[in-house]
């Protein structure tokens, strides 16, 4: 999970960044958590090495899944892209009611669903309607994908959209209380209640669609700027639930197995919360990719859809002919 201000300063970007998220570089208190989660999730998905590198990132690159944390991508302050801003406590005078908090998290879910829909839509350009062959011009064979938000070759657009969906899905578990252990010491804004769920949230499963019932008690953290200690207060310096109090943003992950080490934030270090969030994020990423595969086959039919999926996964489109 990335400390975005530090990252922005490291890259020479002179603006304030939003809350942290699963890490995208190896340094500045992060350990390429987004990359490791994505690789652990898709290790058996049949992606070619270069394709997985482009999607998950590798040393020196953000990849599609890390692009929302890239300072020049323009999404650092987009709360919906990181599941931020859904804070609420059931106490008198809290400045954000439960319905407003739920709307912030509904926007996060909608971001994921739109990205998956965009991936399926872009995939259709890989094998044009009526054709029985891959359009080689839609495959990045010599020049890699950029992931800067501009539309280009179809496979790049597919990977970029999948990266957006995976990123926000992973941040959901890092930034909310869904997977946090419910413990007796919890209760206030500095240690809000965990929901104690194991595994991914059915509410975030794209199969559930936009109409699923909002999970009771689900919140994420307030983020208004850095340092966080100067923000997210109300009344006579009363605290809102801050991102700093709730995030499980940092720790080491084995990319081959998905096993997580100790959390390196206060919330992540308590009760095994980092490992719980990582396990849920891996499962969520797997479910999102399976949804993309199923939708591609449903929309384009078995024959065309299978050829499209082969081109998305393979490094060399000749392997699909």
Report the location of each language-model feature.
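Positively charged n-region of N-terminal signal peptides that target proteins for export
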Residues: 1-4
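Bacterial N-terminal signal peptides
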Residues: 6-14
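Alpha-helical and His/Cys-centered functional microenvironments
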Residues: 7, 38, 171
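N-terminal signal peptide c-region/cleavage motif recognized by signal peptidases
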Residues: 16-18
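N-terminal, motif-rich segments that launch catalysis or mediate targeting to/interaction with membranes
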Residues: 20-163, 175-321
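Catalytic glutamate of the conserved HExxH
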Residues: 164, 168, 172
């Amino acid at each position: 999970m990335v400390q975005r201000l530090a990252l922005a300063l490291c890259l020479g970007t002179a603006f304030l960044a939003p809350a942290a998220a699963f890490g995208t570089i190896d340094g500045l208190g992060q350990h390429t958590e987004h990359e490791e989660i994505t690789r652990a999730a898709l290790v058996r998905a049949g992606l070619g090495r270069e394709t997985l590198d482009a999607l998950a990132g590798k040393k020196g690159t953000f990849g599609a899944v890390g692009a929302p944390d890239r300072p020049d991508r323009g999404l650092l302050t987009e709360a919906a892209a990181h599941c931020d801003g859904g804070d609420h406590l059931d106490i008198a005078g809290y400045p954000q009611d439960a319905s407003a908090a739920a709307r912030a998290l509904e926007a996060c879910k909608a971001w994921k669903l739109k990205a998956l829909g965009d991936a399926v839509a872009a995939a259709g350009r890989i094998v044009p309607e009526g054709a029985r062959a891959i359009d080689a011009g839609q495959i990045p064979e010599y020049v890699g994908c950029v992931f800067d938000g501009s539309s280009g070759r179809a496979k790049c657009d597919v990977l970029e959209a999948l990266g957006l969906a995976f990123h926000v899905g992973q941040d959901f578990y890092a930034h909310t209380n869904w997977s946090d252990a419910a413990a007796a010491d919890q209760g206030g804004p500095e240690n809000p209640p965990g929901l104690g769920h194991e595994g991914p949230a059915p509410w975030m499963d794209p199969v559930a669609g936009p109409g699923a019932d909002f999970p009771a008690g689900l919140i994420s953290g307030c983020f208004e700027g850095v340092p966080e200690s100067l923000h997210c207060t109300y009344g006579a310096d009363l605290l809102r639930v801050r991102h700093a109090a709730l995030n499980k943003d940092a720790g080491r992950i084995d990319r081959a197995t998905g096993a997580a080490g100790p959390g390196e934030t206060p919330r992540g270090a308590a009760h095994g919360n980092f490992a719980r969030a990582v396990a849920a994020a891996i499962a969520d990423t797997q479910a999102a990719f399976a949804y993309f595969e199923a939708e591609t086959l449903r929309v384009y039919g078995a024959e065309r859809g299978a050829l499209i999926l082969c081109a998305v996964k393979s490094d060399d489109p000749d392997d699909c002919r």
